[in-house]
Regions:
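Glycine- and acidic
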Residues: 49-53, 69-77, 98-99, 150-156, ...
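Short, highly selective alpha-helical patches that border small-molecule cofactor pockets
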Residues: 86, 112, 166-168, 233, ...
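Thiamine diphosphate
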Residues: 133-212, 281-285, 420-533, ...
Length: 737
């Protein structure tokens, strides 16, 4: 039975404004709902076996379902079904006092928003009642379509499936005294990264077990049965045990079904009320056991097996998302909301428990809401090499600084799936040691090392960027050709950083072993196209690809990167010895301005070469010699920080929470790139040259990477891509002719 909003409004708490349906009464409320199960001054229920704790956990689960469905239906948009199938598990964790809850499933967003509303976190966004919750759901500057860095109390920027585990593991590493549960959908369990990344992490950090995957095993993915829907309970338990989990805690709703529902997956909201309480008690006990196990040093997983869409408008994959007809007037929506309706008194009780749990609103108590204190780095010990002196390996020069950072900051880690030795940065391993349970001096291995080297780009990128998001310094290193497998999680995190409510150390990466250094390895190792992705991301506002031309400039690039916040800084450099072209002072100016002239000569007409990269400078300098012999003026400009070369209106910098609005002005641009002809040169993606090509008014052209091939030398590979002095001279003469 329900009462209309108008009839009930006088007796309703203010926060209930906007709730469409209320129950007239609830079974057993007078017996188990007299006072909040989480007492005043406490942060959790005292005993998960107490009947009032179980009863109020059930109320909380239904409150989450109701809000999830009502806010999604208010926009006929969003995903209620997945979260609904694990509402009891989420409610149980909150009642047990755990507020640092993360998700691997972006589609669980409306459920998480509902939880943040109930514990009053969303008041920091001006959302104080359900009507405002409805109004601002899936709206700009409101409750974004998927979880992000913008919402108080939640730091789970769930991008593509297979990412949320990184945030939980990162937070667990930094905060050993707290539990970090994270929900995982069984549809997403098909992603290879979820379990493998946890296995890698557990090998490296066997004592860090205070993260808790909560598998939402509901039998369905987005549009069909999940690929693990045919597994038995025993098979699922064996799966997790086979992947190193010591404790597997599973609750199957089917074991409590008294309505003879068909199939292996059932809806607990269809049970009799007594059986609903039994099921909720089992989930609460399981959550308590799993939490204690994870905090006690065992790698643990909690599994709740319940039909997708339990308690909402549809069941199975049909409950995954709403369609245009699923408005608040839709019969299925109305029936589900009326069935899940609570009394005003029950709403007040749920809200009180959620607010008290964990010591207050997640927006005030979650570890992600505060700035992590960082160690002082002191002097980095930069070493300036003489311009024109002996060629040096840029990555090795940077590696020395990285070692110093790690020695000063024990939370700092370096990750690299390809191996630091192969990237010219063996000195990082020597200084910081590879994390491995087997000590071995030959390989610089030590269980307490700071270099994380599983052979998985996702695991490496995920831990590095996850720790940065949580407030710690890191460095992700990779071969340029293989970094693509870690790029999705990096993009997710840097996008979250752009809207994060606090400053945090920038994501810093080092990509090396570029295409020109991989001739013998062939095209499988020659994939500079990743630069096109970062070129596009430069317009986001907080992405800064940098291309130091030598061993001096790479040191100043890293020095600068360490001072920044909420950015994604991608350092791309060769691992081969190359000429020293810039002083430290010049290098720092290049970072500030975006580029710097390496060579300039006069002539009747001037050709400007705008060069992105280090090794590709060689044919450009050779071309300059030929052009100068023909009395053509030549200027060679090294493009070090192309993001600075855009116009302010090209980039969404002013929408970033830590805005960086420094751009080279028109006079500075003309001073660097003004001439009779302009040729952009890169051994990577031509998109990196876009800022220059947009602003130049000269006759211009671009030389860029085309495709890979097996070759005996960098020069041969450049020739295959048209990057030769002969071609550059020919085109220059055509442009000025």
């Amino acid at each position: 039975m329900t009462a209309s909003t108008q009839e009930a409004r006088l007796a309703n708490p203010d926060f209930c404004q906007g709730i469409q349906y209320f129950a007239e009464k609830l079974p057993e409320f007078e017996k188990y709902g007299k006072q909040a199960a989480i007492a005043q001054g406490r942060t959790a229920i005292s005993d998960p076996q107490l009947p009032d704790a179980v009863y109020q956990t059930l109320l909380a689960a239904d409150a989450l379902r109701y809000l999830t469905l009502q806010i999604t239906a208010s926009k006929a948009s969003g995903h209620p079904g997945g979260f609904a199938s694990q509402a009891e598990a989420y409610a149980a964790l909150v009642m047990l006092g755990h507020k640092n809850i993360i998700t691997e499933v972006g589609h669980h967003a409306p459920g998480f928003y509902s939880a943040m509303f109930l514990d009053r976190s969303l008041e920091d966004m001006g959302i104080v009642n359900v009507q405002q919750l409805r109004d601002r759901y899936r709206e700009q500057h409101g409750l974004l379509g998927h979880l992000s860095g913008f919402i108080p109390g939640i730091l789970a920027p769930a991008g593509p499936l297979g990412q949320g585990q990184h945030f939980a593991m990162s937070a667990a590493k930094l905060h050993r005294d707290k539990l970090f549960p994270f929900t995982v959908g069984d549809g997403g369990l098909g992603e290879p990264y979820i379990v493998s990344s946890m296995a890698h992490f557990h090998t490296a950090y066997p004592d860090v077990t205070n993260f808790l995957p909560v598998l939402v095993w509901n039998g369905f993915s987005q549009e069909h049965h999940s690929m693990v829907s045919t597994k038995s309970d025993a098979e699922m338990i064996s799966y997790w045990q086979g992947n190193g989990f010591e404790e597997v805690v599973l609750v199957n709703a089917k074991d409590f079904d008294d309505e003879n529902q068909p199939g292996d997956y059932v809806d607990s909201t269809a049970f009799s009320f007594d059986k609903r309480l039994e099921f909720t008690q089992a989930v609460l006990a399981a959550a308590d056991k799993a939490a204690s196990s994870a905090l006690g040093g065992k790698l643990t997983v909690l599994i709740i097996k319940q039909l997708k869409g339990a308690g909402v408008h549809a069941r199975g994959a049909k409950s995954h998302n709403l369609y245009a007809m699923h408005t608040l007037d839709n019969a299925d929506i109305v029936n589900a909301l009326k069935t899940r309706a609570l009394t005003p008194q029950a709403w007040e009780l749920v809200r009180t428990n959620f607010e008290r749990a964990g010591g207050g609103a997640a927006g005030r108590t979650a570890v992600t809401e505060s700035i992590l204190e960082l160690s002082e780095l002191g002097e980095l010990g930069l070493e300036e090499y003489p311009v024109g002196g002996e060629p040096k390996v840029a990555t090795t020069a940077m590696g020395k600084l990285v070692g110093k950072v790690g020695q000063s900051d024990r939370n700092f880690i370096v990750t690299n799936a390809d191996g630091n030795e192969a990237s010219g940065i063996a000195n990082i391993n020597q200084a910081l040691k590879i994390i491995h349970p087997t000590p071995d001096d030959l390989y610089n291995q030590n269980p307490s090392g700071q270099v994380y080297e599983p052979l998985s780009e996702d695991a490496c990128a995920g831990l590095a960027v996850g720790l940065s998001l949580m407030g710690s310094r890191t460095l992700w290193c990779s071969y340029e050709s293989f970094a693509i497998n870690g790029l999705p999680i990096m993009q997710t995190v840097t996008q979250a950083m752009a809207e994060l409510r606090r400053p945090t150390p920038s994501v810093i990466t080092l990509f090396t072993a570029g295409a020109l250094e991989q001739g013998r390895n062939g095209w499988t190792h020659q994939r500079p196209e990743i630069e096109a992705y970062y070129a596009a991301m430069m317009r986001n506002g907080n992405i800064f690809p940098v291309f130091p031309p030598d061993a001096n400039s790479i040191q100043t690039c890293y020095e600068w990167a360490l001072t920044t916040q909420n950015k994604g800084i991608v350092i791309t450099a060769s691992k081969s010895p190359l000429p020293i072209r810039l002083t430290f002072e010049q290098s720092r100016q290049a970072i500030k301005d975006g580029a710097i002239a390496l060579q300039e000569s006069g002539g009747s007409k001037t050709v400007v070469f705008a060069v992105v990269g280090d090794m590709v400078l060689m044919p450009v300098f050779e071309a300059a010699t030929y052009l100068e012999a023909q009395e053509v003026g030549v200027k060679i400009v090294s493009v070090v920080n192309p993001r600075r070369l855009y116009r302010p209106t090209d980039v969404a910098w002013d929408s970033c929470s830590e805005p960086d609005g420094e751009f080279l002005d028109d006079a500075g641009f003309e001073s660097l790139f003004g001439g009779d002809a302009l040729i952009g040169v890169t051994a990577g993606a031509s998109g990196m040259l876009e800022p220059i090509m947009l602003r130049s008014n000269a006759k211009r052209d671009t030389f860029a990477w085309k495709r890979g091939e097996t070759t005996a030398s960098p020069a041969q590979l450049m020739a295959l891509n048209g990057l030769t002095a002969e071609n550059l001279v020919k085109r220059a003469m055509e442009l000025i002719g």
